[in-house]
Amino acid sequence: MGSVSAGERGDRRDYNGVMTLTSVLPSLRRTIPDPLRPAKWPEYTHPTTDDVIIAGVSLSRLVELCETPCVHTADALVPGSHSKPALRADASVVVVTVEGVHAGDAGERVVLIDAELTRVVALWEETRLLGRVSTAAARVAVVLGGADGGTPSARGHACLPADLREGDLLAIPCRGAVCLHDVRLSA
C-alpha cells in the first residue's frame, strides 16, 4: 500500500507529512529557510533561504568551484541525539543540476538530474532547492538520475517547488561517504 503525498492530499504538508510555516505560506521562504531534519544531514548543517551551509562550506559556492555533480562529506549525526556526532559514520550531500522538468506518462511531474544516484543511499525526502528562493508551493516530483542520453535511473520522490526549472540546483543528502565517481555520469 503506497503512501499519499501532500500534493495528492491537497493540503499544505511537506513530503514527510509535516506542516510548517513555509509550507502553509510559501512567501515566507524569502525571509526564513525551509526547516530541515538535522539527523538526515551532515554535522554542522544549517539552511539559509537560498543555500545550505555545512561546516562553513556553502554548497552554492562549492558548485561554482567544482560544477555539478559535486559532493560534500562530513560526520553524520546520531538520530535522536540532539545533534551528537556519530563517531564512525559519515553523511554526504550531492549537489546536482536539473536538466529538465516535464510531465510523465501518468501525469506526474518528472525531474531529470545530471547525476547517477543508483550507488548511493539518497534521502530524497530532504532534497532542497539551492541558488534561488522559490515562493511557489511545493509538489511531489519523481526525480530521475542518469539522464545522459541513456535510460534514466535512480528513481526517487522529492517535494520540490512547482516552479522548478532547468538549470536549478538541488542538494540531496545521502547516508555514508559518497565519492564523486559514485555519482558522476559515465562519459
Q: Residue locations for each model-derived region?
A:
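A charged N-terminal "starter" segment
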Residues: 2-89, 160-170, 176-187
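Charged (often Lys/Glu-rich) extended helix/loop segments that serve as interaction or gating elements
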Residues: 21, 57-58, 63, 83-187
